[in-house]
Amino acid sequence: MLLSIGMLMLSATQVYTILTVQLFAFLNLLPVEADILAYNFENASQTFEDLPARFGYRLPAEGLKGFLINSKPENACEPIVPPPLKDNSSGTFIVLIRRLDCNFDIKVLNAQRAGYKAAIVHNVDSDDLISMGSNDIDTLKKIDIPSVFIGESSANSLKDEFTYEKGGHIILVPELSLPLEYYLIPFLIIVGICLILIVIFMITKFVQDRHRNRRNRLRKDQLKKLPVHKFKKGDEYDVCAICLEEYEDGDKLRILPCSHAYHCKCVDPWLTKTKKTCPVCKQKVVPSQGDSDSDTDSSQEENQVSEHTPLLPPSASARTQSFGSLSESHSHHNMTESSDYEDDDNEETDSSDADNEITDHSVVVQLQPNGEQDYNIANTV
């Protein structure tokens, strides 16, 4: 599921482009403006601007050619006189109707019933173009012919020179252009879909990254299982590989399974916030049995060679004893000491317990020149 969302987001730009082109190509077939080309018997032509109605059929893309007839009565609020060649299928007639007195849909419906193929409604005492509409759904369902609206001066010119009686004819030509809202609405829809997909992708990516980081980091309970050693002069450790400062008496050192030691204040944030590997040898720290998935992922990552891969394997780095590493002979001893130094508040309790037991045995630690420690136990009765 997550993979499919990622693949969908990768192609969001392509999806947006394809949908935009298809929607615009479809909407461009819907004209919102048109022109009337008028021709008289001398083949003189004139163009008049009009505005198609919001109901009825659209003008065909090639235009509609026909003969212009004045409506009788002019307002067409009642049944009008049919065209002279109503029964001749070869002739197409367009009626010119005056505005006012009744609704636009009634005028156009009466023209359709009379046998006209289109209707032209003109304004009265104005050349303003009006978008004709209707709220009567039943009437709108009955209208099948296209209709346009023109100004009064255009209507007067058509009556004077381009009517059927004067040997003229007209062509209603659609103009394939769209207003801003026709472009804006599909654009906003597509942009909204893309934004939703982007938000889904970002949330999915955030959840995946957070889950991956949690698997690659050490939990608090796992960190507490790592031994802590209190540094004393003569110990094998010398310098913290993170802060590059020499250890001082009383410093708390975190001992990792690879025998590398660091300041607790230095290595703890690395293990809990960055990655649960040794900063020097990259060996995994405390692999948990219940975290098999993270172990598998980490092992696969460690097997891949990259610029962060250490030059020496973990076993070799342990033998070099660099940056405060601890030999195997002392790691077990430090594991036993860690319980004594895990918390400073428990030192007094531990020391008092040791005083009670000193009457039975005492431990004498002698440092040998070769760096190894011999333990001699003597009875002090």
From Swiss-Prot:
Cytoplasmic compartment spans: 204-381
Subcellular localization(s) per the UniProt record: Endoplasmic reticulum membrane; Late endosome membrane; Lysosome membrane; Nucleus inner membrane
Biased composition annotated in UniProt, kind: Acidic residues: 339-357
InterPro entries assigned to the protein according to its UniProt record, in alphabetical order: E3_ligase_sorting_rcpt (IPR051653), PA_dom_sf (IPR046450), PA_domain (IPR003137), Znf_RING (IPR001841), Znf_RING/FYVE/PHD (IPR013083), ZNRF4/RNF13/RNF167_PA (IPR044744)
Sugar-modified residues: 88
Residue spans of biased composition, Polar residues class: 317-328, 365-381
Signal peptide (UniProt feature, chain positions): 1-34
Role according to the record: E3 ubiquitin-protein ligase that regulates cell proliferation. Involved in apoptosis regulation. Mediates ER stress-induced activation of JNK signaling pathway and apoptosis by promoting ERN1 activation and splicing of XBP1 mRNA. Also involved in protein trafficking and localization.
Name assigned to this protein: E3 ubiquitin-protein ligase RNF13
Gene name of the encoded protein: Rnf13
